[in-house]
Amino acid sequence: MAKKIMGYIKLQIEAGKATPAPPVGPALGQRGVNIMEFTKAFNEKTKDKMGFKVPVVITVFTDKSFTFVVKQPPASALLMHAAGLKGGSSNPLKNKVAKLTQAQLMEIVNRKIEDLNTDDKEAAAKTIAGSARSIGIEIVD
């Protein structure tokens, strides 16, 4: 028999650095989840994504057990990392702060496509390119 779901918790946590401190502790504590068990499992699963804040969806069951799914970092974070930036442009229409090649864009698309609402790489590339434009990164051939 399947477990009954109590609810979902969506958080963005620094990969490999989850601690019982806010926002993790209070969010899990409200549902009665074992916080230390989650932080150890999360840190172990995300140690290969260090340096990124990763979205995680935690499914909490009525018996206080849980499962979680770690998603890819946000597209903007991947784009800024590839361009070597700390932040985007304050005026992205006029001030371009970096350039990425089509190959770099496709590398990000291949990593991010599982979280996007499309299976078509061309459509995913347009989505990621739009995110790049909105933070002042120009895509060149």
UniProtKB/Swiss-Prot annotation:
<dbReference type="InterPro" id="IPR000911">
    <property type="entry name" value="Ribosomal_uL11"/>
</dbReference>
<keyword id="KW-0689">Ribosomal protein</keyword>
<dbReference type="GO" id="GO:0003735">
    <property type="term" value="F:structural constituent of ribosome"/>
</dbReference>
<keyword id="KW-0687">Ribonucleoprotein</keyword>
<comment type="subunit">
    <text>Part of the ribosomal stalk of the 50S ribosomal subunit. Interacts with L10 and the large rRNA to form the base of the stalk. L10 forms an elongated spine to which L12 dimers bind in a sequential fashion forming a multimeric L10(L12)X complex.</text>
</comment>
<dbReference type="GO" id="GO:0070180">
    <property type="term" value="F:large ribosomal subunit rRNA binding"/>
</dbReference>
<dbReference type="InterPro" id="IPR020785">
    <property type="entry name" value="Ribosomal_uL11_CS"/>
</dbReference>
<dbReference type="Pfam" id="PF00298">
    <property type="entry name" value="Ribosomal_L11"/>
</dbReference>
<dbReference type="GO" id="GO:0006412">
    <property type="term" value="P:translation"/>
</dbReference>
<keyword id="KW-0694">RNA-binding</keyword>
<dbReference type="Pfam" id="PF03946">
    <property type="entry name" value="Ribosomal_L11_N"/>
</dbReference>
<comment type="function">
    <text>Forms part of the ribosomal stalk which helps the ribosome interact with GTP-bound translation factors.</text>
</comment>
<dbReference type="InterPro" id="IPR020783">
    <property type="entry name" value="Ribosomal_uL11_C"/>
</dbReference>
<dbReference type="InterPro" id="IPR020784">
    <property type="entry name" value="Ribosomal_uL11_N"/>
</dbReference>
<keyword id="KW-0699">rRNA-binding</keyword>
<dbReference type="InterPro" id="IPR006519">
    <property type="entry name" value="Ribosomal_uL11_bac-typ"/>
</dbReference>
<dbReference type="InterPro" id="IPR036796">
    <property type="entry name" value="Ribosomal_uL11_N_sf"/>
</dbReference>
<comment type="similarity">
    <text>Belongs to the universal ribosomal protein uL11 family.</text>
</comment>
<dbReference type="InterPro" id="IPR036769">
    <property type="entry name" value="Ribosomal_uL11_C_sf"/>
</dbReference>
<keyword id="KW-0488">Methylation</keyword>
<protein>
    <recommendedName>
        <fullName>Large ribosomal subunit protein uL11</fullName>
    </recommendedName>
</protein>
<dbReference type="GO" id="GO:0022625">
    <property type="term" value="C:cytosolic large ribosomal subunit"/>
</dbReference>
